[in-house]
């Protein structure tokens, strides 16, 4: 870390390489300690139509899970939901599911909801969400197949990697790129300063 920033101990409770890169872009020193919580079980138990509430709940559970093992650290956790017509599109994990997701999203508007929280000593200090709205071009079967073979975005909600070739799939985007990638940076920076986790 440069002498420009003074900071307290921070942990990113995420295994996402994109979130790791975004955090690194801020010049922070931090540990990466992914949570062991069962996200699918939490999603199954969630019986509300409030999808933002689900995303915030997942972020909080991840942060609290890690915080109990690292009470001296400020824990940053996040969750990302890809939503269209009140349906959540989880990570496809395989080629055929990715094809199905892109077929369903083709030509339509959907949202990427990024949810964040900061926890210290098992206390929730800050929570936040931000939504980006994206519209895909009408995608041919040939385009879907060629894109998936090129990028294999099977670990990405929505079956695309917006940080890479995925940008070519869209005709309209409203919202910041870091929100689409799952870690809205300016709100996080302001929260870290306001909580005196980081000083300049």
Curated annotation (Swiss-Prot):
CDD domains xref list: Maf
Documented EC number(s): 3.6.1.9
Molecular function as annotated in GO: nucleoside triphosphate diphosphatase activity
Cofactor: a divalent metal cation
Gene Ontology biological process: nucleotide metabolic process
UniProt cross-references to SUPFAM superfamilies, sorted A to Z: ITPase-like (SSF52972)
Highest taxon of source: Bacteria
A GO CC annotation given for this chain: cytoplasm
Swiss-Prot/TrEMBL keywords: Cytoplasm, Hydrolase, Nucleotide metabolism
Intracellular or extracellular location(s): Cytoplasm
KW Nucleotidyltransferase (keyword) present: no
Enzyme class, UniProt record, top EC level: hydrolase
Main location, first listed in the record: cytoplasm
Pfam annotation, one family: Maf
Reactions catalysed: a ribonucleoside 5'-triphosphate + H2O = a ribonucleoside 5'-phosphate + diphosphate + H(+); a 2'-deoxyribonucleoside 5'-triphosphate + H2O = a 2'-deoxyribonucleoside 5'-phosphate + diphosphate + H(+)
Disulfide bonds: none
Catalytic residues of the enzyme: 79
Similarity annotation: Belongs to the Maf family.
Cited NCBIfam families: maf
Chain's role: Nucleoside triphosphate pyrophosphatase. May have a dual role in cell division arrest and in preventing the incorporation of modified nucleotides into cellular nucleic acids.
The protein, known as: Nucleoside triphosphate pyrophosphatase
Originating species: Legionella pneumophila (strain Paris)
